[in-house]
Amino acid sequence: MSIKARLIAMSFLQFFVWGSWLISLGGYMIVTLNFTGVEVGSIFSTMGIASLFMPAIMGIISDRFYNAEKVLGFCHIVGAALLLLASNVTDYPTLYIIMLFNSMFYMPTIALSNTVSYNALEKNGLDIVKSFPPIRVWGTIGFIAAMWIVDILDWTKSPYQLYLSGGSALLLGLYSFTMPKRPPLKSSDAKSFANSVGLDAFVLFKSKKMAIFFVFSMFLGAALQITNLFGGSFLDDFKTLYPGTFGVEHPNLLLSISQISETLFILTIPFFLQKFGIKKVMLFSIIAWVFRFGLFAIGNPGGGLILLILSMIIYGMAFDFFNISGSLFVEREADPKIRASAQGLFMIMTNGLGAFFGG
């Protein structure tokens, strides 16, 4: 099997694990376990808490002590055990603790899988800029595939979604150990904890422009978390008004249009950036988020289904345009000495604080 095919399989499984439960777990907890909205939100906020420090810690471990592919495999195997354990838990306090630890081991794997991919491509003499994006797209395809499987098998309100996620995490954990070796870096090349989590980039808050950008990033991170958290249960609330409709019977299939749109819109970004520039593309994203939630609010699974579908399609623009143009904006505005840290700060504001407040 070629290295690209192996990396595609890894990327597919990486997000298949997440897609198995991220969109549907909220509905399972509210409808089946009878958790309150606050309890569900707090469980989802564990991803934000974990994102504040665990990627940096695991990054340091892989930079200084152990091979990155081994750390990746270890994290997924531990995560698999936690997910399988969570499938048999029905009380809030225990499930919260388990999902907190699961987040602590899953969230770092997103960056670790990128590190393993970059290393494998470099070792095989391939251009990362050209080769990695088509590989990463398979991650989104894996996410969509997991959502469809959970929906078609009618597991959206069942703990079986956690079995699926746990089983695929175990498979990925074992598979990770077969990836090309990425040994620890030399001590002079290893990042410090402060550098890894972006603490030395806080100087950017002195700039009004950057301060506004980072605060807005946090709000968008919160909006994304709300979408992931309550989208399925929001559609489920229509079951008495529109029984038997597509949106009620297959919420994951409907919501997966968002990820399909995301996959397609990412291909248009080079054109929009060249035509309009970073700032205008970011403005398009802000406007798209307004329409995303506006259409979602006034739509319904009955006569308003087209509005829900449009909301899902617009999500692709809202998510991709801000994430990618935002990252490029940080790269352009930050001093070269702290660019890596600035990107870390961008991730903290969106996936860390944003996800926490959104939960």
Model-derived features: positions:
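Central cavity-lining transmembrane alpha-helices of secondary-active solute carriers
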Residues: 42-60, 253-269
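Cytoplasmic membrane-interface "Motif A"-like loop-to-helix N-cap segments
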Residues: 63-76, 274-286
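Helix-loop boundary and gating motifs at the non-cytosolic
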Residues: 1-48, 209-251, 323
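Hydrophobic core of transmembrane alpha-helices in multi-pass small-molecule transporters
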Residues: 12, 82, 92-110, 218-219, ...
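Juxtamembrane intracellular "pre-TM" segments in multi-pass secondary transporters
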Residues: 1, 179-215, 240-242
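C-terminal ends and interior cores of transmembrane alpha-helices
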Residues: 77-91, 288-301
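C-terminal transmembrane helical hairpin of 12-TM major facilitator-type secondary transporters
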Residues: 280-326
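Symmetry-related core transmembrane helices of the 12-TM Major Facilitator Superfamily/SLC fold
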Residues: 161-178
